[in-house]
């Protein structure tokens, strides 16, 4: 009896030691993480989160735990950074440590770690360097791409004139125009506005982009290991992404058949040439998977973010006709009605520049940023983040940081104007992110936004079917992306 009692005590002691060792190993493995709400097994902090307002849910948690905290999205453990100081400290001051890429489950289903956007830093580094250089070769940042944007703006103006002042949904007018600019770089040509395949591609992009902002999309980010096997809207998003990938693959096959290594026609040609140059290097990142996925990255990002920002911008200007009138006045004074706007005009147009910046700030297109990952055990403030820890840099919390913006929840162009009415930069303006993984299309997007906005407003006044005070500028969805409400408007010739 005594022996069995001693044996039981010994077994309990061993079990206790094993549990303590396991806890110690877990603590060592996960370092000293920031505080956060206690998670439940598998579902994490799901009960404390509202998938219809994920950004607001996380910001509410930050009120209790501070600007750096830990949250569990289902089984995913995430370190969340809020406010300009924390985000800059991580992505700029400790850029190398935070240069990894975290998960975005909807897109990871297709990309699987390939392509310039959703890959690790080791893979992304040579792809980014190549993409930036090649975009420059095809005119980005130069007069060449400015002329391409001006040409496309001309087609858009004619399309709006053809509506004869009728009330229309501007969504696909804008997306096909913006998409044609990046298409001319990656595919070497533009699409006709009525091309059925082109319109189908735009619907696929819009559908999958909007899915990431929906409550179901946010739920999928938490429980994708289960939901990817279930019926639901996520399956439609997968089909749309597959359709986009197949389209890119066809374009690549066409280019392969007609490639002239001495005369690249577009981004795809340039990548194929680089593949040939490095075909004997087994570690090269220049292979077919990265070609298809990087081209899709550029095509998708180069279409949706700018066109959605413009669509939201039109809604804001109809809500604030006084702002629209001031932009019209500045355009008439600086540019007039007899020539197209040029990118260099913005230096003389501080109010228009401020309005465009405020549209980007207010719309807050990617509020939670793309997830990052620390590339090694990293000391951050008083915490120790283990290698591989996922990080959400909350870009929306930077764009709405009250330390930098006096009316963070309002549309207020004066945020970017000094007391003399001159344009004023802000350290908290980072809609394209910052650090090593900043948006590589930032320069192109800035030029597009200025030239498209000024050209459209040079030619038209905006009219809504609602009175300004009745226009709802709150977003339709806020998840990975911010999606404006669907609306109609009239383009009235000036």
From Swiss-Prot:
Domain of life: Eukaryota
EC number(s) per entry: 1.14.14.1
Membrane topology per record: Peripheral membrane protein
GO CC terms: endoplasmic reticulum membrane
Modified sites of kind N6-acetyllysine: 379
Keywords noted in UniProt: Acetylation, Endoplasmic reticulum, Heme, Iron, Membrane, Metal-binding, Microsome, Monooxygenase, Oxidoreductase
Protein name: Cytochrome P450 2A10
GO MF annotation, one: heme binding
């Amino acid at each position: 009896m005594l022996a069995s009692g001693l044996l039981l005590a010994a077994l309990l002691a061993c079990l206790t030691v094993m549990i303590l060792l396991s806890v110690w190993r877990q603590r060592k493995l996960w370092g000293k993480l920031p505080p956060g709400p206690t998670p439940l097994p598998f579902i994490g902090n799901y009960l404390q989160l509202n998938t219809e307002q994920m950004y607001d849910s996380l910001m509410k948690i930050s009120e209790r735990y501070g600007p750096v905290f830990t949250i569990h999205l289902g089984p995913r453990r995430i370190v969340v950074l809020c406010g300009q100081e924390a985000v800059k400290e991580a992505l700029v001051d400790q850029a190398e440590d935070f240069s990894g890429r975290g998960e975005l489950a909807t897109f990871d289903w297709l990309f699987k770690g390939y392509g310039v956007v959703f890959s690790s830093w080791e893979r992304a580094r040579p792809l980014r360097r190549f993409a930036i250089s090649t975009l420059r070769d095809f005119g980005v940042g130069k007069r060449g791409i400015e002329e391409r944007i001006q040409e496309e703006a001309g087609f858009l103006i004619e399309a709006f004139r053809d509506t004869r002042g009728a009330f229309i949904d501007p969504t696909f007018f804008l997306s096909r125009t913006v998409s044609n600019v990046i298409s001319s770089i990656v595919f070497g040509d533009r699409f006709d506005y009525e091309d059925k395949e082109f319109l189908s591609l735009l619907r696929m992009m819009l559908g999958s982009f909007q899915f990431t902002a929906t409550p179901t999309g946010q739920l999928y980010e938490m429980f994708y290991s289960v939901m990817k096997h279930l019926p639901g809207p996520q399956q439609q998003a997968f089909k749309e992404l597959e359709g986009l990938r197949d389209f890119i693959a066809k374009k690549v096959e066409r280019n392969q058949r007609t490639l002239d290594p001495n005369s690249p026609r577009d981004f795809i040609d340039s990548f194929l040439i680089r593949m040939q140059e490095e075909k004997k290097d087994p570690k090269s990142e220049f292979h077919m998977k990265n070609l298809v996925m990087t081209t899709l990255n550029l095509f998708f990002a180069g279409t949706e973010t700018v066109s959605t920002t413009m669509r939201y911008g039109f809604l804001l200007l109809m809500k604030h006709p006084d702002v629209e009138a001031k932009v019209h006045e500045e355009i008439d004074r600086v540019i007039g009605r007899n020539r197209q706007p040029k990118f260099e005009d913005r230096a003389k147009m501080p109010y228009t520049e401020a309005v465009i910046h405020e549209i980007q700030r207010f719309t807050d297109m990617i509020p939670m940023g793309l997830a990052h990952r620390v590339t090694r055990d990293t000391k951050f403030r008083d915490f120790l983040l283990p290698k591989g820890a996922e990080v959400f840099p909350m870009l929306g919390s930077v764009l709405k940081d009250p330390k930098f913006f006096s009316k963070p929840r309002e549309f207020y162009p004066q945020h970017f104007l000094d007391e003399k009415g001159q344009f004023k930069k802000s350290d908290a303006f980072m809609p394209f992110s910052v650090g090593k993984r900043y948006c590589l299309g930032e320069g192109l997007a800035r030029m597009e936004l200025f030239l498209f906005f000024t050209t459209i407003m040079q030619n038209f006044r905006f009219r809504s079917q609602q009175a300004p005070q009745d226009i709802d500028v709150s977003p339709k969805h806020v998840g990975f992306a911010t999606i404006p409400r669907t609306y109609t408007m009239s383009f009235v010739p000036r």
